């Protein structure tokens, strides 16, 4: 039988062994209840290439963080919900994630309309929201001063008031077109984007020769294209979702009328590239991320995505990269706050002390109390569709990516 001294020594040895094991394996050191994070987007339907890519990027980041020990010693768990790109579904999901699932924050929102309809519930509950794909200019301005004392809506995507001037600068100034036509879908995203395009054109002293609207699931753009052609348009500026944008390119081919397409970032989606096929070649759009391994972080991210999801080409590289980065930003704030309390997370986001090395960029105090946009105008570059994939449109953009474009510190 062991005496008291032998028992104490054995117990101490076991304790040391456990501690060493925990130190050598951070994942096993996690304790306490999981930290629930809402994850919402369209995982089915016409916007799903964006939603699924965003979701996959988020899940990759969560896996990386949990492997390294989690946050505050607790694992992260994503509570996924498919909003189907429908405003009313997004509203229901917001209330469920807040009241039933008790999430500490929510990541996602692909569609501007869904974001605008849903995020007021998070604002009222004082739960931070990260719009990691939706780009409508008004999204982060919905609850600003003096109407609201605090704002719980953040974004790490290039807003439309960044993209629209870029599109106009590319088409009018850099390429020298003089008679633009605007084709925008009928959603909040398309119509708010159209307004931003019109403002950017007006700043150049230019007015669209034709402004046309189309609906989600439209498959024939002949009428809109004929009116643009008859008006003498020499370039088409687009704001819409991928499947319908492909019908613009296909309609041009049917009419034998090939003028360039310059539009918002959604021209990079697989639903545009695959549906338009060769007709989509040459389409140009702003991008925060192009699937190129030109930094160590991007190389690791691309390889991890390809291995995890068994695909060579991401359906929406921008969505995947921004989804990944949104998790890194949120967890940096939780770590700094030392808490999962919504107010403390918001305060930490507005004054992040730690640089966050993301896939899109390195974030160095990206937010303040009055600026909830992580992406500044110097970060996006232009991509162009070439042989079924997006590549940099300009050589200087390739160089810019290698240098990594960073938002000036607030």
Write out the residue ranges for each language-model feature:
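Extracytosolic ligand-binding ectodomains
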Residues: 2-10, 19-410
């Amino acid at each position: 039988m062991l005496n008291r001294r032998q028992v104490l020594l054995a117990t101490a040895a076991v304790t040391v062994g456990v501690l060493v094991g925990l130190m050598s394996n951070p994942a096993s050191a996690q304790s306490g209840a999981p930290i629930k994070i809402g994850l919402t987007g369209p995982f089915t339907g016409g916007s799903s290439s964006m939603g699924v890519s965003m979701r996959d990027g988020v899940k990759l980041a969560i896996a990386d963080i949990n492997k390294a020990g989690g946050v505050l010693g607790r694992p992260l768990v994503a509570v996924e919900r498919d909003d189907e790109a429908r405003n009313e579904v997004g509203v229901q999901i917001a209330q469920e994630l807040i009241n039933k699932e008790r999430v500490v924050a929510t990541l996602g929102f692909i569609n501007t309309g869904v974001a605008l309809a849903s995020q007021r519930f998070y604002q009222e509950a004082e739960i931070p929201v990260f719009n990691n794909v939706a780009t409508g200019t008004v999204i982060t301005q919905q609850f600003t001063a003096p109407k609201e004392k605090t704002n719980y809506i953040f974004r790490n995507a290039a807003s439309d008031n960044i993209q629209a001037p870029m599109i106009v600068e590319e088409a009018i100034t850099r390429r020298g077109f003089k008679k633009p036509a605007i084709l925008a879908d009928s959603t909040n995203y398309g119509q708010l984007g159209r307004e931003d395009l019109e403002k950017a054109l007006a700043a150049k002293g230019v007015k669209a020769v034709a402004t046309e609207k189309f609906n989600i699931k439209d498959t024939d753009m002949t009428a809109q294209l004929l009116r643009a052609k008859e008006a003498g348009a020499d370039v088409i500026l687009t704001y819409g979702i991928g499947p319908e944008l492909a019908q613009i390119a296909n309609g041009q081919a049917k009419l034998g009328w090939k003028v360039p397409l310059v539009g918002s970032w959604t021209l990079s989606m697989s639903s545009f590239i695959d549906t338009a096929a060769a007709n989509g070649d040459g389409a140009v759009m702003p991008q925060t991320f192009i699937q190129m391994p030109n930094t160590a972080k991007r190389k690791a991210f691309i390889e991890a995505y390809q291995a995890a999801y068994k695909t060579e080409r991401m359906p929406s590289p921008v969505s995947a990269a921004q989804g990944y980065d949104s998790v890194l930003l949120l967890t940096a704030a939780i770590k700094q706050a030392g808490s999962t309390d919504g107010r403390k997370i918001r305060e930490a986001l507005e004054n992040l002390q730690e640089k966050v090395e993301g896939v899109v960029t390195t974030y160095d105090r990206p937010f303040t109390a009055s600026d909830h946009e992580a992406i500044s105008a110097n970060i996006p570059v232009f991509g162009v569709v070439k042989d079924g994939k997006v590549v940099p449109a300009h050589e200087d953009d390739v160089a810019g990516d290698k240098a990594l474009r960073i938002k000036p510190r607030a």
